Amino acid sequence: MAGNSIGQHFRVTTFGESHGLALGCIVDGCPPGLELTEADLQVDLDRRKPGTSKYTTQRREADEVKILSGVFEGKTTGTSIGLLIENTDQRSKDYSEIKDKFRPGHADYTYHQKYGQRDYRGGGRSSARETAMRVAAGAVAKKYLKQEFGIEIRAYLSQMGDVSIDSVDWNEIENNAFFCPDASKVDAFDELIRKLKKEGDSIGAKITVVAQGVPVGLGEPVFDRLDADVAHALMGINAVKGVEIGDGFEVVNQRGSEHRDPLTPEGFSSNHAGGILGGISSGQDIVAHIALKPTSSITVPGETITRSGEKTELITKGRHDPCVGIRAVPIAEAMLAIVVMDHLVRHRGQNFGVQTETPKI
């Protein structure tokens, strides 16, 4: 398996399985001198970890991260940062019945066909449990970006099923279990989840992630465009089936006179492009949206086959999220932070001394 790393200069490599002994990652390329403690990383991990609300999986993992290397006397040294989280609440017996069956909608069949074997305990490496390490690594990037450049990266749940938000209040997001910025929609989300639990079913969701304060100039055309790397990172999140930058697929219905973002001496008058032009950050907010599918781990019976190809039926047991989009909020933040951090380091290495006569708007 070769696809365990992301980034070029700020590079994150993860390892571990859902029911293994531990999860871990190596973060390369973090500049030296950043004050960093385990508590700094724990904040976002606590936002992602399972068992924290009645709306998500009841698997209870402390997700306490340990810094193994790369930090000395409270500051990063510039060497590889090693991070580790031990798994403590595995219930592998929940998966014994699917040892020889493929869960429809999951990676069971494709992993088996590609590798000739699979870890059926919670999906092994394909499980979203792996994203805990992305969040830990992303927290390193988020702290550096905010402390050194004033860049802030935040996300929120913008839609669950047919319930969409009408407004965004950044101060409201941490006041509810849904990371919802619209207080008027919390009860509707609550009602939807309760209904799904009774039915044993699940629902999809849409997450919006925003990077504020990103300077103009990040992105490496033509193949490492900033929007291309953002899409790559967000698409790599478990259950994500679609990514939009700015207005995304709405541009199909727009005219050029509507979509273009006029420039004025005071700044851009709109942001349909989502803060990226020609693959390079424009200085506006970077705005992206991800669509997450409804999880297939449900108690509604579904058709599948056994390892020998025989027809059978499957009811998924275990502890699962009725909507995986809820806990995907800090994951989306982490992935965007990793990409912005990587491009910032790359830009500084090549274009540090570039100056133009045109004022930055």
UniProtKB/Swiss-Prot annotation:
Biological process terms in GO annotation: amino acid biosynthetic process; aromatic amino acid family biosynthetic process; chorismate biosynthetic process
Functional pathway: Metabolic intermediate biosynthesis; chorismate biosynthesis; chorismate from D-erythrose 4-phosphate and phosphoenolpyruvate: step 7/7
Enzyme class: lyase
The protein's Enzyme Commission number: 4.2.3.5
Entry-linked InterPro entries: Chorismate_synth, Chorismate_synth_AroC_sf, Chorismate_synthase_CS
GO cellular component, one term: cytosol
Cofactor field: FMNH2
Chain positions recorded as FMN binding sites: 125-127, 238-239, 278, 293-297, 319
Binding of NADP(+), residues: 48
Bound cofactor: record note: Reduced FMN (FMNH(2)).
GO molecular function, one term: chorismate synthase activity
Keywords: Amino-acid biosynthesis, Aromatic amino acid biosynthesis, FAD, Flavoprotein, FMN, Lyase, NADP
Parts forming coiled coils: none
Reaction(s) the record says it catalyses: 5-O-(1-carboxyvinyl)-3-phosphoshikimate = chorismate + phosphate
UniProt-listed SUPFAM superfamilies: Chorismate synthase, AroC
Family: Belongs to the chorismate synthase family.
Function: This reaction introduces a second double bond into the aromatic ring system.
Quaternary structure note: Homotetramer.
Protein name as catalogued: Chorismate synthase
Gene: aroC
